Amino acid sequence: MPAPYEKGSAKKGATLFKTRCLQCHTTEAGGAHKVGPNLNGVFGRHSGQAEGYSYTDANKQKGALWEAQTMSDYLENPKKYIPGTKMAFGGLKKAKDRNDLVTYLLSATK
C-alpha cells in the first residue's frame, strides 16, 4: 500500500517537475497540451477529463478523483494505478519525492 501523502517541499517538487514532468506536461492556465495533458486545474477533477486532450479509455474509465493522495498513489507507478495508460513515466518510488512533487503541483496547477 502506498505511503500516505504528507506535505513536502514545493521547491524540491518544482525541481522534480522540471526534470521529470515538464517534457510532457504544462501547468499554466490556458497552456497547451503536450505529449501529456496540461495539468492546470487537475485537483478536484476526475482522470481522463482535461478538455481537448485525447485520453486512453483506461484513463477515462478509471474515474479517479485527483486529490493529493490519489495523485501520490498514481505517481508511485502510473501503469499499475491505471493499467492501459499511455503515460510512459515509470513512477517515483520514494514517498518523499512524491510528497514534494504533489505539494508543488497543488500550488502550480491552481
UniProtKB/Swiss-Prot annotation:
Its main location: mitochondrion. PANTHER family: CYTOCHROME C. One of its GO terms (cellular component) is mitochondrial intermembrane space. Binds 1 heme c group covalently per subunit. Pfam families: Cytochrom_C. It is found in: Mitochondrion intermembrane space. Belongs to the cytochrome c family. It comes from Pachysolen tannophilus (Yeast). InterPro entries: Cyt_c-like_dom, Cyt_c-like_dom_sf, Cyt_c_1A/1B. GO terms for molecular function: electron transfer activity; heme binding; metal ion binding. Heme c binds at residues 21, 24-25, 87. The modification N6,N6,N6-trimethyllysine is found at residue 79. Keywords: Electron transport, Heme, Iron, Metal-binding, Methylation, Mitochondrion, Respiratory chain, Transport. This is Cytochrome c. The keyword tRNA-binding does not apply. Electron carrier protein. The oxidized form of the cytochrome c heme group can accept an electron from the heme group of the cytochrome c1 subunit of cytochrome reductase. Cytochrome c then transfers this electron to the cytochrome oxidase complex, the final protein carrier in the mitochondrial electron-transport chain. Coiled coil: none annotated.
